Regions:
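A short, flexible loop at the N-terminus of ABC-type nucleotide-binding domains that lies
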Residues: 2-31, 38, 81
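Helix-to-loop junction immediately C-terminal to a conserved catalytic motif
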Residues: 60
Length: 294
């Protein structure tokens, strides 16, 4: 999406100056700004305790920040009307399924809240993912419960899908199958997706954009393919590295001092430019980006 469209498209969600702290604790979110546009698939990355779950709960209006604003579909997130709520799908990190229900009872209950509920899709996924309809949820395996949560979130074709570690209890085959279903949903409906996971290979399969969370803020958000093309690691004396950055117009993302007046710099070129062949620049992996930027 070009920069003009980015500037003019009405966001699905927008957070501005959001700060949130738990009682008597340090702030978890610190003046955070974030925009999610229609059709974006964003992988949210951060260390344990960085505040990813808190951010997603604030995004959905489940936690109200002390300062700043959160808007979903042009409404305050904590005061959404029923029509706006019916456009959201959510898989929380901790299961919120009604364990005394059977899957059939649970899905019938939630069906009443969503005008776009797709019963054929539900039936297909229940069969494909081998979930017993009439077995009490408390008796299902952890992986089956996670699949059921995912079905509930996908069933009504949401315009915003928020996934907090949605595949952590699935085996590799189960993760791949869910991710394929997720990609199909995005391609069919242009769903906006926020996907938080520690499994970096999963993000490489589905996330077109990455958001790196550090210090209670979104430190960087950019398309994954652009980051792979534009980010390199430079190592040399401070003077050598600085001269190369200035010559190329590159920006520094992370600087690490080394012995002997040398430094290691993760740098990013301006969009539309390329690293010259003579530059002593090391390509980066998604793991490198995660380690340096979170």
């Amino acid at each position: 999406m070009n920069q003009h469209l980015l500037a003019t498209t009405t966001p699905t969600a927008e957070l501005a100056g959001v700060s949130l702290a738990y009682t008597l604790g340090e702030p978890v979110l610190r003046g955070l700004d974030w925009r999610l546009l229609p059709g974006q698939v964003v992988g949210l990355l951060g260390r344990n305790g960085a505040g990813k779950t808190t951010l997603l709960e604030a995004l959905l209006g489940l936690r109200e920040p002390q300062t700043g604003t959160v808007r979903l579909f042009q409404q305050p997130a904590h005061r959404l009307d029923d029509a706006a709520r019916s456009r959201i799908g959510y898989v929380p990190q901790q299961s919120d399924l009604f364990e005394a229900f059977t899957p059939a009872q649970l899905l019938a209950y939630f069906k009443s809240f969503y005008p776009r509920w797709n019963e054929a899709k539900v039936n297909g996924l229940m069969s494909r993912w081998d979930i017993a309809r009439d077995k009490r949820i408390s008796k299902l395996s952890v992986g089956q419960q996670q699949r059921l949560s995912n079905i509930r979130a996908l069933a009504h074709h949401p315009d915003l899908l928020v996934l907090d570690e949605p595949v952590s209890s699935l085996d590799p085959a189960g993760r791949r199958d869910f991710l394929a279903e997720l990609v199909e949903q995005v391609l069919e409906r242009g769903t906006t997706v926020v996907f938080s996971t520690h499994i970096l290979s999963d993000l490489e399969r589905v996330a077109f954009n990455l958001a790196f969370m550090s210090g209670g803020r979104i430190a960087l958000q950019a398309p994954l393919d652009e980051l792979m093309d534009e980010v390199r690691v430079l190592t040399g004396t401070t003077a050598e590295v600085q001269a190369l950055l200035q010559r190329l117009g590159a920006g520094s993302l992370k600087r690490t001092p080394l012995a002997g007046g040398r430094e290691r710099v993760m740098a990013r070129l301006p969009a539309g430019t390329q690293w010259p062949a003579d530059a002593d620049a090391q390509a980066v992996s998604l793991e490198d980006l995660f380690m340096e930027l979170t």
